[in-house]
């Protein structure tokens, strides 16, 4: 009987995508139930560099360092500057939706939802953006946690 109550370690398979693309629509999402969170859209580039294709990811920003970086870049995104980032996204899944307005009104579209785990580099209008050091962000996050 005691064997049934023995704790077994839980393990997971992780699915991550790494790439680069343009950061858009940085926002705070306030769900009806639950805590607010930072979200963004990434227009990921892939294929031939002369004529790349784009895949959009709608992300909840999950990594502590990623949250700090995205919030620092929010002003540049809102000023319609071109913010190009390197990223790692996890737990992404496609989701269908119906366009509510515009030329594609009534058509079915697909959005890839995921969690933005890491920002590896950033450029604003082609200029390198200095990312905060990893240990500094983790220390700040720990210092601001309620006791």
Describe the function of each predicted region.
Residues 1-147:
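Single-stranded nucleic acid-binding surfaces, predominantly the OB-fold ssDNA-binding core
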């Amino acid at each position: 009987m005691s064997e049934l109550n023995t704790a077994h370690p839980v393990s997971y398979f992780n699915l991550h995508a790494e790439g680069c693309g343009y950061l858009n629509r940085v926002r705070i999402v306030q769900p009806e139930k639950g805590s607010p969170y930072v979200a963004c859209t990434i227009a990921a580039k892939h294929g031939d560099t002369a004529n790349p294709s784009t895949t959009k990811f709608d992300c909840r920003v999950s990594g502590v360092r990623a949250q700090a970086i995205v919030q620092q870049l929010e002003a540049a995104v809102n000023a319609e500057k071109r913010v190009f980032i390197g990223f790692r996204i996890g737990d992404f899944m496609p989701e269908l939706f119906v366009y509510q307005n515009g030329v594609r009104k009534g058509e079915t579209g697909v959005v890839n939802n995921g969690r933005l785990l890491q920002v590896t580099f950033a450029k604003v209008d082609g200029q390198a953006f200095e990312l905060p050091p990893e240990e500094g962000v983790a220390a700040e996050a720990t210092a601001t946690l309620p006791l």
